[in-house]
């Protein structure tokens, strides 16, 4: 009776309770994510395809936050967001060394995951879902009036949580995004457009807590 009263008056005490931690469907993770692009592009100048022209994007690291909700023992929903990093977009193929511009972006990935059988303290999972990448800023380099579009894409997810002690765990996750976007600008007097394939691989390591 006393414990119940304390929980009603001080909800934070309930969060610290082992019984509550075991029953809560909510998880939270904070960690670092590496974004490794597998980039290519179809480049057009004044509407004409540039033979062999392509593009590349620099890899990034970002602080990320991951929120999870357990639907039941087998299924959960996860969403990851982060501090927006900036990638440098450069020419490739027959356009080597051309600094096209910089893009500050933020992918938000939502996946439905299935929990595989646990291996001791290791709890693996697989899943799939959707990503929305928002472009916060496009900065000029050799391309003037450089601009890139927001984009949606499918996402795949595989990972594992490794229990440390009651309620705390280490989380390792890999997410693959099949992401394309359109970019445009001016290279001198010529109008430049590109259909850019980014297809990043997001590799995360984080500390997690069940609340």
Swiss-Prot record:
A single GO cellular-component term on record: outer membrane
SUPFAM superfamilies: OMPA-like (SSF56925)
Pathway as given in its UniProt record: Aromatic compound metabolism; naphthalene degradation
A matching Pfam family: OmpW
Keyword flag Secreted: no
Biological process terms in GO annotation: catabolic process; transmembrane transport
Keywords: Aromatic hydrocarbons catabolism, Plasmid
Top-rank lineage group of the source organism: Bacteria
Something else known: Encoded on an unnamed 75 kb plasmid.
Role description: May be involved in the conversion of 2-hydroxy-4-(2'-oxo-3,5-cyclohexadienyl)-buta-2,4-dienoate to cis-O-hydroxybenzylidenepyruvate. DoxH and doxJ encode different enzymes that may have interchangeable functions.
Protein name: Dibenzothiophene metabolism operon protein DoxH
């Amino acid at each position: 009776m006393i414990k119940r009263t304390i929980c009603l008056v001080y909800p934070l005490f309930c969060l610290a309770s082992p019984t509550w931690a075991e029953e809560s469907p909510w998880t939270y993770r904070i960690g670092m994510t590496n974004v490794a692009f597998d980039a290519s592009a179809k480049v057009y100048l004044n509407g004409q395809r540039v033979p062999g022209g392509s593009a590349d994007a620099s890899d990034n690291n970002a602080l990320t936050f991951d929120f999870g909700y357990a639907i039941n023992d087998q299924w959960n929903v996860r969403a990851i967001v982060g501090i927006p990093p900036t990638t440098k977009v450069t020419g490739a193929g027959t356009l080597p060394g051309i600094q096209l511009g910089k893009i500050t972006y933020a992918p938000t990935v939502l996946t439905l995951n299935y929990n595989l059988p646990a291996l001791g303290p290791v709890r693996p999972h697989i899943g799939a879902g959707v990503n929305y990448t928002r472009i916060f800023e496009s900065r000029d380099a050799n391309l003037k009036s450089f601009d890139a579009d927001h984009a949606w894409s499918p996402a795949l997810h595989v990972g594992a949580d490794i229990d440390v002690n009651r309620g705390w765990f280490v989380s390792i996750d890999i997410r693959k995004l099949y992401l394309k976007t359109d970019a445009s600008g001016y290279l001198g007097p010529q109008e430049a457009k590109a259909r850019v394939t980014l297809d990043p691989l997001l590799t995360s390591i984080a500390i997690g807590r069940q609340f």
